[in-house]
């Protein structure tokens, strides 16, 4: 089956695992998925990220992170720029998620970065998703 939106697939798998409080999520790997997962790791939304090979397919194993009593750390994930409707922002229009409590993932000419890093670098780009 050909996947039309691999980023939405990644976010949906993480969202579904978060709802039922799974410890581990496995998704097919790509450079953009790896970059988004790395941002989630550095921002503290997931516990661990591991890349491995399953036969001929590269996979990402994402270890979910929960608080005490299995409280969710990730309260929301939203895909913003979709294949049918791309959303871009200029360097002075970089969005803030929940007044800075969340993270916007932006694809820029300097790579895939958070909204704070994009503001610091002074670049705009395609707004991929919001995480809060």
From Swiss-Prot:
A GO term from the CC aspect: ribonucleoprotein complex
A molecular function GO annotation: rRNA binding
Pfam families linked: Ribosomal_S8
Domain of life: Bacteria
UniProt GO BP: translation
Keywords in alphabetical order: Ribonucleoprotein, Ribosomal protein, RNA-binding, rRNA-binding
Subunit structure: Part of the 30S ribosomal subunit. Contacts proteins S5 and S12.
Protein purpose: One of the primary rRNA binding proteins, it binds directly to 16S rRNA central domain where it helps coordinate assembly of the platform of the 30S subunit.
NCBIfam families in alphabetical order: PRK00136.1 (NF001109)
Family designation: Belongs to the universal ribosomal protein uS8 family.
Listed name of the protein: Small ribosomal subunit protein uS8
Native species: Clostridium botulinum (strain ATCC 19397 / Type A)
Gene: rpsH
């Amino acid at each position: 089956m050909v996947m039309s939106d691999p980023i939405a697939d990644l976010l949906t798998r993480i969202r579904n695992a978060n709802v039922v409080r799974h410890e581990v999520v496995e998704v097919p790997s790509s450079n953009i998925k790896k970059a988004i997962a790395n941002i989630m790791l550095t921002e503290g939304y997931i516990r661990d990220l591991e890349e491995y090979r399953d036969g001929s397919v590269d996979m990402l194993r994402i270890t979910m992170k929960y608080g005490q009593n299995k409280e969710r750390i990730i309260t929301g994930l939203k895909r913003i720029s979709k294949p049918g409707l791309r959303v871009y922002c200029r360097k002075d229009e970089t969005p803030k998620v929940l007044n800075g409590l969340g993270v916007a993932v932006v694809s820029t000419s300097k790579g895939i970065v958070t909204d704070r890093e994009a503001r610091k670098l002074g670049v705009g780009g395609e707004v991929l998703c919001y995480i809060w």
